[in-house]
């Protein structure tokens, strides 16, 4: 299990009895997923990234892959440059990537990572929505196996069932 933090609670579309604030958070998350993060969300991601691992300087930020490489790029392209500047570290969108896109039915994922980039690094993995922790565990284990010193997770949202 890897230490992680998140910014907002996410109530899935199946939950119809949500407050106006929860509905607005849901919309903010959906905007992010479609590549249009608000300035406020970018500010929150940077702020939370700084405090998530305040006891340890981060060497490298990467992103938890979406279901396709195109979705990963869409979600994280606008925030990667800001993170690099604000955290004063390297940011690689594809330090971890899908070997091939996820199967839409089984959701089976096969990750690869750029060993030469992650070796010896203290890593922050930023993802969209934390539900079970399975993706963070798979990505974290892969990073450690390929030489990362430590792995922390930061998510835009955590699913509330």
Segment roles from a protein language model:
Residues 72-124, 134:
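Short, glycine/charge-rich flexible loops or terminal/linker lids adjacent to PRPP-binding catalytic cores
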Residues 1-60, 94-119, 159-161:
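Active-site-facing substrate-recognition patch
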Residues 59-71:
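Short beta-strand-loop/turn "lid" adjacent to the catalytic site in phosphate-handling enzymes
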Residues 60, 124, 151-154:
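A structural signal for isolated positions on well-ordered beta-strands in alpha/beta enzyme cores
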Residues 2, 84-92, 146-150:
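Structural alpha-beta junctions
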Residues 127-139:
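A phosphate-binding catalytic loop at a beta-strand-loop-alpha-helix junction
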Residues 10, 14, 137-161:
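PRPP-dependent phosphoribosyltransferase catalytic core
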Residues 19, 69-74:
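Short, flexible/disordered intra-domain loops and linkers
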């Amino acid at each position: 299990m890897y230490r992680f933090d998140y910014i907002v609670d996410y109530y899935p579309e199946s939950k119809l009895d949500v407050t106006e604030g929860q509905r607005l958070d849901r919309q903010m998350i959906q905007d992010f997923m479609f590549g249009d993060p608000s300035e406020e969300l970018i500010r929150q991601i940077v702020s939370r990234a700084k405090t998530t691992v305040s006891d340890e300087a981060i060497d490298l930020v990467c992103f938890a892959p979406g279901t396709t490489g195109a979705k990963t790029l869409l979600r994280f392209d606008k925030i990667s440059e800001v993170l690099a500047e604000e955290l004063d570290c390297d940011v690689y969108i594809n330090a971890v990537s899908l070997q091939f896109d996820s199967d839409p039915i089984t959701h089976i994922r096969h990750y690869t990572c750029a060993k030469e980039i992650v070796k010896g690094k203290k890593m922050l993995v930023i993802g969209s929505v934390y539900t079970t922790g399975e993706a963070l565990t798979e990505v974290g284990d892969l990073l450690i196996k390929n030489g990362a010193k430590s792995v922390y997770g930061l998510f835009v949202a955590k699913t509330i069932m």
